[in-house]
């Protein structure tokens, strides 16, 4: 189970300082990057560690994103998906994996692309709403 985060970089690159800055500023979270090697690293948020892998966007990524967009009928991210040359794949331990969603949202906030997973395509704002639901499911 993963999140795929579209990135407007032609090739994946670890943007450690920017990710750490946005994690602190917008998510009140500290990210620790461990074992960086090329476009692969482990990211720790407290005791939770998730692997991320950057790669070039492929046709399956675009097809999956456009399929969801077409089903919703709003074309909200269509241009962003097409501008994104790379994708970050964020490891998840399950559907309620808060750490993985924070990591995906932080990457999306820097790389300016949507997040794809669980049959949905969404941006940082929706990710923040999902995070709020994970913290307090009984509102």
Predicted regions and their residues:
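Acidic (Asp/Glu-rich) sequence patches and key acidic residues
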Residues: 1-139
């Amino acid at each position: 189970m993963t999140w795929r985060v579209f990135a407007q970089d032609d090739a994946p690159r670890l943007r450690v300082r920017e990710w750490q800055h946005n994690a602190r500023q917008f998510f009140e979270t500290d990210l620790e990057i461990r074992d960086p090697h090329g476009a692969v690293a482990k990211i720790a948020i407290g005791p939770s560690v998730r692997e991320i892998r950057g790669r070039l966007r492929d046709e399956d990524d675009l097809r999956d994103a456009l399929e969801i967009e077409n089903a919703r009928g709003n074309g909200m991210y269509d241009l962003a998906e097409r501008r994104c040359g790379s994708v970050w794949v964020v490891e998840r331990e399950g559907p309620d994996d808060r750490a993985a969603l924070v990591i995906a949202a932080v990457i999306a906030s820097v790389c300016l692309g949507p997040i794809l997973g669980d049959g949905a395509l969404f941006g940082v704002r929706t990710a923040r709403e999902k995070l709020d639901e994970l913290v307090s499911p009984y509102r």
